[in-house]
Amino acid sequence: MKKIEAIVRHFKVEEVKDALNAKGVQGMTVTDVRGFGRQKGHMETYRGTEYAVEFIPKSKIEVVVSDANAQTVVDAILSSARTGQVGDGKIFISDLQSAIRIRTGESDDSAV
């Protein structure tokens, strides 16, 4: 199994969700996060005072899939989240040792 974590722009979450649903992904977790990469930060003005925003708000999408479906899910995220601009985000792929569905006790691929 693979855990796929994607950091994407907020306005791309629905598009990514729809792309993943079309590929058969049945569940995901979405979290509001803040961070920076090459995009760094930006300047904003509030009540006439300019200040630096160092951490950019993004959304983190987490999906657990079988090894066989991992590349399909990554491709769906890439195609739906990309704008071509700095700050589109990142995808992280990790091996997942085990997963257990609490309600039934099913484990591993049966649990996802």
Regions found by a protein language model. Give the residues of each.
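Positively charged, small/polar-rich N-terminal and surface patches that mediate targeting and assembly
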Residues: 1-112
